Curated annotation (Swiss-Prot):
Signal peptide: none annotated. This is Malate synthase, glyoxysomal. Keywords: Glyoxylate bypass, Glyoxysome, Peroxisome, Transferase, Tricarboxylic acid cycle. It catalyses: glyoxylate + acetyl-CoA + H2O = (S)-malate + CoA + H(+). The active site is at 177 (proton acceptor), 462 (proton donor). GO terms for cellular component: glyoxysome. Gene3D superfamilies: Malate synthase, domain 3, Malate synthase, domain III. Pathway: Carbohydrate metabolism; glyoxylate cycle; (S)-malate from isocitrate: step 2/2. PANTHER family: MALATE SYNTHASE, MALATE SYNTHASE 1-RELATED. CDD domains: malate_synt_A (cd00727).
Amino acid sequence: MELETSVYRPNVAVYDSPDGVEVRGRYDQVFAKILTRDALGFVAELQREFRGHVRYAMECRREVKRRYNSGAVPGFDPSTKFIRDGEWVCASVPPAVADRRVEITGPVERKMIINALNSGAKVFMADFEDALSPSWENLMRGQVNLKDAVDGSITFNDKARNKVYKLNDQVAKLFVRPRGWHLPEAHILIDGEPATGCLVDFGLYFFHNYAKFRQTQGSGFGPFFYLPKMEHSREAKIWNSVFERAEKMAGIERGSIRATVLIETLPAVFQMNEILYELRDHSVGLNCGRWDYIFSYVKTFQAHPDRLLPDRVLVGMGQHFMRSYSDLLIRTCHKRGVHAMGGMAAQIPIRDDPKANEMALDLVKKDKLREVRAGHDGTWAAHPGLIPICMDAFSHMGNNPNQIKSMKRDDASAITEEDLLQIPRGVRTLEGLRLNTRVGIQYLAAWLTGSGSVPLYNLMEDAATAEISRVQNWQWIRYGVELDGDGLGVRVSKELFGRVVEEEMERIEKEVGKDKFKRGMYKEACKMFTKQCTAAELDDFLTLAVYDHIVAHYPINASRL
């Protein structure tokens, strides 16, 4: 099916919504096939049943943040030691997703979905979260695209290339990542309040696709999900209850829905057993969301001047705290019988520089070999061109689809709180400050104009990179970091940062060209990014702080067709 488009006619039509549900996004006949009365009713049921639990979980986050800002540090919870020490295991991994050696990720855009499903990867994670700017158009077209993908009818006509894209006979297994618990959906009001973004993403997708998915992709299981940004097992418990509620609505067996949780916040690394325990009937593992993990490290220790990060390009898996996090995730997952997924390879093939391309691909190869030797069962890639390299690295597992049972099982308790909290080593340079600023502004400019997955300097960047750039700049300014390298002896200040911003804006204009710079939202992004970096208090999420800039409410006093 080719995606239709329709013209919005103000005050002509509204969505057929149940009582208490108000859709404030643009009306579109295609979107109306997703936003049906029954589908909106299901989302409303989820919202009403779980909003109190979500509010409590978010208040707990704020309370923990206050403790960290008063000098406390994260650690293992003594009250749940019995879970960590217990011999329980999660439900068996469904055969349909036993082999996850290489997973490709990307936004829920139509061409992207087709190319990713055809890429040769074992799994495609379709993203409503960090790789998508959550505008109404992007979210609803994403739901339409996924519905077409699940029923096998999706096509895309690229008129510029005179090419029609469609699915191959063999495609990757589809996982969907909804937004995190903290993000609202301002275009859908339920009982007068914005809906919880992830319940909208999950609810609409599940409602329309569970039956077809289980038949064509899941071999009786599914749908499959990735769950982001959790900080505590209580948040996993909410997801488990949401899954059970959805299974009951659909009349399918408990444990049909399966999910992998991204461990991408510092507090969550101390909760991995507890998270798996809460989701033990619905889990298919954990994933090292390493870029957001670095962001979370800075955010968690925002009031700890003794824990300043070096240049972000130096905070890789060679750092002790990062290696410890990865090793603990592997040991935890394998003890509980589920996948331990590796992190993202964000490199993009460099077509105009063969030597640089070879060096970049060699780095990917080394990183993926490190992952498979450490015990990971699979890994992530951002570009189809990386899949052969990643697949070759994970061929070291032999004929086994994973290493859950074949890998030597080390004792997870050997990894201590001190290992997970060790301060990373490295220099802090003026170029590090410049790169953060240049990348942060360009990413935000793209996000504000509808793109959440952005190629920058031969890497495919998503919101995690902008978040790291923002919080590290904030941290360095806040504590007047003394720079190494060319800036030796100079301390970071608002004045220095102001000069860096001016110079980097000039560089961005030269790199993208005057016309694109003028047409884009670079100046607006610069103001927002600068404000975030110099604020007295650090906002929890950049994407939440600037979300209102992409919300577009439409009239609701329209007549119903």
